Structure formats: structure tokens, C-alpha cells
From Swiss-Prot:
Family: Belongs to the bacterial ribosomal protein bL28 family.
GO cellular component term, pick one: cytosolic large ribosomal subunit
Pfam families, sorted: Ribosomal_L28
PANTHER family reported for this sequence: 39S RIBOSOMAL PROTEIN L28, MITOCHONDRIAL, LARGE RIBOSOMAL SUBUNIT PROTEIN BL28M
Gene3D superfamilies found in the cross-reference section: Ribosomal protein L28/L24
MF annotations from Gene Ontology: structural constituent of ribosome
Keywords per UniProt: Ribonucleoprotein, Ribosomal protein
Natural source organism: Proteus mirabilis (strain HI4320)
Protein name as catalogued: Large ribosomal subunit protein bL28
GO terms, biological process: translation
Source organism phylogeny: Bacteria, Pseudomonadati, Pseudomonadota, Gammaproteobacteria, Enterobacterales
Length: 78
């Protein structure tokens, strides 16, 4: 399963670990993803989305119906 938020599109980014001596080694910063079930009142069913913490805040703000409409417009399955 890919590490991509279905709502915001956040994905892993690369950067460096830095020691006290400032040696750089490559690492990945992963998004804070969770599989979460949302109740969709209009469809009378639960929808499971893999969303980041920010994605959950977007759903709280815009509403699950609006977010699902955006996903449908992008052609993404949920």
C-alpha cells in the first residue's frame, strides 16, 4: 500500500539525518497516515480512507461529502 494521503496527496519526502558532527545520511520523512472509517450519511455506509492528520482536519472543515466529491472528480477509488 502506498504511503500517500488520499485527501491531501501528501507523500514521503527525502532529507538528511544530522549527527552532532553534522554528518549527513539520507532518510525519508513519512506522512502521518491512518486508515480511518468515515460515515457517509447520504450513502448510509462507511468509507475507509488512508488519510494524514492534516487530511482529517480538511475533512472536519469541508465535510466528508465534499471531500468524496473531490476524490470522484480526480478519478480516485475509495
Amino acid at each position: 500500500m502506498s504511503r500517500v494521503c488520499q485527501v491531501t496527496g501528501k507523500r514521503p519526502v527525502s532529507g538528511n539525518n544530522r549527527s552532532h558532527a553534522l554528518n549527513a545520511t539520507k532518510r525519508r520523512f513519512l506522512p502521518n497516515l491512518h486508515s480511518h472509517r468515515f460515515w457517509v450519511e447520504s450513502e448510509k455506509r462507511f468509507v475507509t480512507l488512508r488519510v494524514s492528520a492534516k487530511g482529517m482536519r480538511v475533512i472536519d472543515k469541508k465535510g466528508i461529502e465534499s471531500v468524496l466529491a473531490d476524490l470522484r472528480a480526480r478519478g480516485e477509488k475509495y
